[in-house]
Amino acid sequence: MRRIKIFDTTLRDGEQSPGASMSIEEKVEMALMLEDLGVDLIEAGFPVSSPVQFEAVKRVASAVQKPIVVGLARCVEKDIDAAYEALKDRPKDKRMIHVFIATSPIHRKYKLRMEKEEILERIRRYVGYAKQFFDLVEFSAEDASRTEVPFLIEAYKTAIEAGATTINVPDTVGYALPDEFGELIKTLREGVPGIENVDLSVHCHNDLGLAVANSLAAVQNGATQVEVTLNGIGERAGNCALEEFVMILKVRKDKLPYETGIKTELIYPASRLLTHITGLIPSRNKPIVGENVFLHESGIHQDGVLKHRETYEIMKPSDIGRSSETLVLGRHSGKHALRKKLETYGIKLDEETFQKVFEKFTELADRKKEVYDDDLFSIVSEVLREPINGYKLVHFHVHTGNTLLPTAAVVLQVGNEKREAAEAGNGPVDAIFKAIDKALGIQPKLEEYIIQAVGTGKNAQGEVKLTLRIDNELYSGRGVSTDIVEASAIAYINAINKYLIAKGLLRKNGGAE
C-alpha cells in the first residue's frame, strides 16, 4: 500500500475560520494532540503576520518531537526571515517553510498586478532564498486549479529547480470537480520535470462540498501528501476534513490501496478537544465526528442494528475512539486517576497546567456527584483558554423574576485592578452582559450564543459558546458552570479577553492599557 503523508493545517488555515482563534497555549495543546494522532506535518502558523503568530510557531516547534513543523511565508524576504527565526532551533529534518505566490489570471491581474515572468522570477528568487535556511521547502501556487496548465507546469518546474522539496497544488476557492482535479494532478505528475524527486501535495477547500472528493481524486492520480484540518474547519466553507479523508481510506481499503500514519482511535478525542478549544461545534450529521453518526431512530434501523451492527454501520464507534463509557471520575478520585484518564484521550499537560486542571476537577466534583468525559474536556480547555493577564469574573449577583426588571452586578479583576458595574437587561443573561460592557467600556455585538449540556442528568453543567463582533472582527468565547448565567458571563469575558490581547490592550504585568 502507498503511504500518504498527512499535512495538518488546523493551527494555521483552520484557525482562519471566523471565531476560531486559539491562544498560544491552546495551539501547543492541540499540536501535542495532533502529534499523538500521528500527523506527519503540522503547519503551526504564519510567523510574520503578528508577534502572537510568531511565538505560537516557536512554541509549537519546541513542544512536539515527531512531526515536521511548518511555517507559512509569502515570496517575500521578511516572511522567510521570520519563519526561520521561529523555527531555527528545531532540527533541520523536522522543520519546513511553506512559501506561496498566486498564479491564476485573476490573481495576477487584480491582486498581484504582475506578469507571468515576474511571478516566475519571484518563485526562483524566494524559493532559492528559503533554501539557504531550510532543507525542506514546500512551494504552493495559490489558486492552482484556476491557473493555465502550461504556466502552472512552468511555475512548479521553476520551484523544483530552485530547491523545493514539496510542490503543493491548492484548490484555493474550492472550484475544481474531482475528475478535472484528478486529471490536473496526473498532468502535473507527467509534465513537470523533476517531480518524481519531490512530494506532490494537494490543499483542497470545501466551497462546493468537494474538498475530500478532490483530495481522493488527487491521491488516485499520484499525489503523495494531503493537506487537511480537523473537523474540516478553515477559511469560508473549510478544508478537507482529516477524519473524513482518513476514514474513507480505512473503510474502503478494498478500492483504495493507500494508508496513513493516523491512529484513528484518537480521531474523536482530537475532534472534541478542538471543539472545546475553538467553540466551533461540528453539525450533528457531520460525517465521522457528528453526534448523530452512531444514532438510529428508525424502528427498522434499530431492529437491524440490534441484530447485527453492520446492517447499518460501516464502522465501529471504537474505530474513531468513541466510547459509550462516559462516567469516569468522582470526588474521591485522585491525581493519578485523573492524569491516566486524560492520557487515554491523548491529553498531555505540564505539571503546572495539570495542577490547575486538578483543582477545577475537585471543585466540580464537590458540586456534582458524577464527572463525565465531556466535563474533563471542558475543564482542560477552560484552563488552556485562561489568558494570563485577562479579566476574570471575581463576583456577580443577579436579581430576576417574572415580575421584576432583571439586573446584574459584576466585579472583574485583572492584576491588581478591579472594575465594578451594574446594569438592567432583558433577562439575567442580557443584564450580566450589559454590566460587563459597562465595566470594561466596550460595546460588542453578540453574533452567536449556544448553550448545551455537558454530561447527563440534572447535575449536568451548562456550556455556553458565543461569538462577539468587536471592531468588525469576530472573537469566540466559552464558559462552563453548573450555573448558566455564570457560564454565560465567563464565555463573554473570555471573548473580550481575546480581543484585548489581540489588540495589545492588556499590559504584560496585568492591568488594562
UniProtKB/Swiss-Prot annotation:
Listed CDD domains: DRE_TIM_IPMS
Protein's recorded name: 2-isopropylmalate synthase
The keyword Transit peptide is annotated on this UniProt entry: no
Organism, scientific name: Thermotoga maritima (strain ATCC 43589 / DSM 3109 / JCM 10099 / NBRC 100826 / MSB8)
Family affiliation: Belongs to the alpha-IPM synthase/homocitrate synthase family. LeuA type 1 subfamily.
Pfam families with a match to the protein in the record: HCS_D2 (PF22617), HMGL-like (PF00682), LeuA_dimer (PF08502)
InterPro entries according to UniProt: 2-IPM_HCS-like (IPR050073), 2-isopropylmalate_synth_dimer (IPR013709), AIPM/Hcit_synth_CS (IPR002034), Aldolase_TIM (IPR013785), LeuA/HCS_post-cat (IPR054691), LeuA_allosteric_dom_sf (IPR036230), LeuA_bact_synth (IPR005671), PYR_CT (IPR000891)
Cofactor(s) required, per the database record: Mn(2+)
